[in-house]
């Protein structure tokens, strides 16, 4: 599956090329921001099997993502974080992403998905063929350990403790 705005910076043309090469249907969810771009991708990749599902409420989207073999992220720019990667992994879905920006930092290559060189559709296609090697439970465990509310709260507490300790060291000096 693919989740994101339908716009050039999300790299949907690479997803279409991936679909054409692998023969797999890729479900696409997101706001249709650039309809001309969507049509151009379809024309340029006539063998792609993209199934546009529209923009869904979060709970429905998570249920849909959970039925995917993988989530594909092909950003053409440096994404700051990549909430979609967290949402997919929380449902046990591995993520295939380019080595660019936040998603590449979230995905543990070979454990919760695959991180491939940016703009390398051949590497994405290879990753698709290996997707069954990923243990979906590990995807969920990674999100629980690193991105759950409890994990984030623990990091904030640690940070505050470090700031207080540093402040005390300055006062004592």
Task: Tell me what each language-model feature is.
Residues 108-110, 114-120, 128-133:
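Conserved acidic donor-binding segment of nucleotide-sugar-dependent glycosyltransferases
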Residues 69, 92:
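A short alpha->beta transition loop at the rim of the catalytic pocket in nucleotide-sugar-dependent
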Residues 75-82, 104-105:
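Nucleotide-sugar-dependent
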Residues 133-169:
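A charged, aromatic-enriched C-terminal amphipathic alpha-helix characteristic of glycosyltransferases
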Residues 62, 85-90, 104-105, 111:
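Short alpha-helical segment that forms part of, or immediately flanks, the ligand-binding pocket
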Residues 94-97:
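Short hydrophobic beta-strand element within catalytic cores of glycosyltransferases
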Residues 28-30, 38-59, 63:
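Nucleotide-activated donor-binding/catalytic signature segment of Leloir-type glycosyltransferases, i.e.
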Residues 1-29:
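Conserved donor-binding/catalytic core segment of Leloir-type glycosyltransferases
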């Amino acid at each position: 599956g693919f989740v994101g705005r339908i716009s050039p910076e999300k790299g949907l043309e690479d997803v279409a090329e991936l679909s054409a090469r692998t023969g797999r249907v890729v479900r696409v969810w997101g706001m249709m921001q650039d309809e001309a771009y969507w049509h151009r991708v379809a024309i340029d990749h006539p063998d792609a099997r993209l199934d546009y599902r529209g923009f869904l409420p979060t709970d429905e989207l998570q249920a849909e993502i959970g039925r995917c073999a993988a989530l594909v992220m092909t950003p053409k720019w440096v994404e700051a974080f990549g909430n979609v990667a967290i949402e997919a992994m929380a449902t046990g879905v591995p993520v295939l992403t380019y080595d660019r920006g936040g998603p590449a930092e979230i995905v543990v290559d070979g454990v919760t998905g695959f991180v491939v060189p940016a703009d390398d559709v051949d590497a994405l296609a290879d990753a698709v063929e290996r997707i069954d090697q990923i243990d979906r439970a590990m995807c969920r465990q990674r999100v629980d350990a690193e991105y759950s509310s409890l994990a984030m709260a623990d990091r904030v507490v640690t940070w505050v403790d470090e700031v207080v300790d540093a402040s005390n060291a300055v006062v004592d000096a």
